[in-house]
Curated annotation (Swiss-Prot):
GO molecular function ontology, one term from the record: 2,4-dienoyl-CoA reductase (NADPH) activity
Protein name, per record: 2,4-dienoyl-CoA reductase [(3E)-enoyl-CoA-producing], mitochondrial
Protein source organism: Mus musculus (Mouse)
Annotated coiled-coil segments of the chain: none
A Pfam family recorded for this sequence: adh_short_C2
Keyword Magnesium assigned: no
Gene name, Swiss-Prot/TrEMBL: Decr1
Residues recorded as bearing N6-acetyllysine in the entry: K42, K49, K97, K106, K244, K260, K315, K319
Modified residues (N6-succinyllysine): K42, K49, K73, K97, K106, K244, K260, K319
Length: 335
């Protein structure tokens, strides 16, 4: 699940036997506290600053859909901090302009805001022309615009299905193809990045439209990685696990009921932060990753492998119970 949000780390050092609550998130539908059930999180503290050199994107242009909030805003902030001239797009121009001004005032680099509904191919066409006019052909293209909600599939309407697939699959295709054609015409390469989800590969109940659309996005990017490398373009994918944002959690966990369950199935013992994902995104879009093409990077603290293992729930077995189990196993004769 791409659940992205603004992170706030205020952990207090304690003895290993009593890590105590650590506040990681102060924004969202519900404040999350790390519990004593996940003391291992102290070994996996998030690094919230950019890892690349400050000039890694100097002279480069980055285009980010869904760039006004959440993960899109975080990636834009990191790219701008590292020298890129950024162009952000979404439907809400007021939010975009506020984000552009906020980031530009911090980094000193230009951030342009363009209103675009990625579901509308004509609007995407005009947006790409404006992008090229104000900033030039992009070196980085991040398809981050998304939509999702939870629902039993038998309750879905055609409009519910269409709402998600139009944004996620069709919108990504319109943006990618429109920019790609312009780049081919200009004989210019670029790094494309798609933000999907860990269940794009496995499928998931109750988010069937999103799962289907994200799976299509991954197939599209892998196909273009094979086809358009000859034009200097490469395509990679990040599958985020649970990362908290107000926008995502308000639709996927509106009561805050499932946060602890999420942490319980993440071996690293905490949710991810948007800064960590922004670091991964900037690396994949940088020249340092010029030989990475067609890759799918799972970014979930180990959640997927935990859920895949038949016996991983045995972590709840106590030492005393293991002593009993071992004794019973040793007494077993034959096959």
């Amino acid at each position: 699940m791409a659940l992205l949000g603004r992170a706030f780390f205020a952990g207090v050092s304690r003895l290993p036997c009593d890590p105590g609550p650590q506040r990681f998130f102060s924004f969202g539908t519900k404040t999350l506290y790390q519990s004593k059930d996940a003391p291992q999180s102290k070994f996996f503290q998030p690094v919230l600053k950019p890892m690349l050199p400050p000039d890694a994107f100097q002279g480069k242009v980055a285009f980010i859909t869904g760039g006004g909030t959440g993960l899109g805003k975080a990636m834009t902030t990191f790219l701008s901090t590292l020298g890129a001239q950024c162009v952000i797009a979404s439907r809400n121009i007021d939010v975009l302009k506020a984000t552009a001004e906020e980031i530009s005032s911090k980094t000193g680099n230009k951030v342009h805001a363009i209103r675009c509904d990625v579901r509308d191919p004509d609007m995407v066409h005009n947006t790409v022309l404006e992008l090229i006019k104000v900033a030039g052909h992009p070196d980085v293209v991040i398809n981050n615009a998304a939509g999702n909600f939870i629902s039993p599939s038998e309750r879905l309407t055609p409009n519910g299905w269409k709402t998600i697939t139009d944004i996620v699959l069709n919108g990504t295709a319109y943006v990618t193809l429109e920019i790609g054609k312009q780049l081919i015409k200009a004989q210019k390469g670029a790094a494309f990045l798609a933000i999907t989800t860990i269940y794009a590969e496995s499928g998931s109940g109750f988010v069937m439209p999103s799962s289907s659309a994200k799976s299509g996005v991954e197939a599209m990017n892998k196909s273009l990685a094979a086809e358009w490398g000859r034009y200097g373009m490469r395509f990679n994918i990040i599958q985020p696990g649970p990362i908290k944002t107000k926008g995502a959690f308000s639709r996927l966990d509106p009561t805050g009921r499932f946060e602890k369950e999420m942490i319980d199935r993440i071996p690293c013992g905490r949710l991810g932060t948007m800064e960590e994902l922004a670091n991964l995104a900037t690396f994949l879009c940088s020249d340092y990753a010029s030989w990475i093409n067609g890759a799918v990077i799972r970014f979930d603290g180990g959640e997927e492998v935990f859920l895949s293992g038949e016996f991983n729930s045995l972590k709840k077995v106590t030492k005393e119970e293991w002593d009993i189990i071992e004794g019973l196993i040793r007494k077993t004769k034959g096959s």
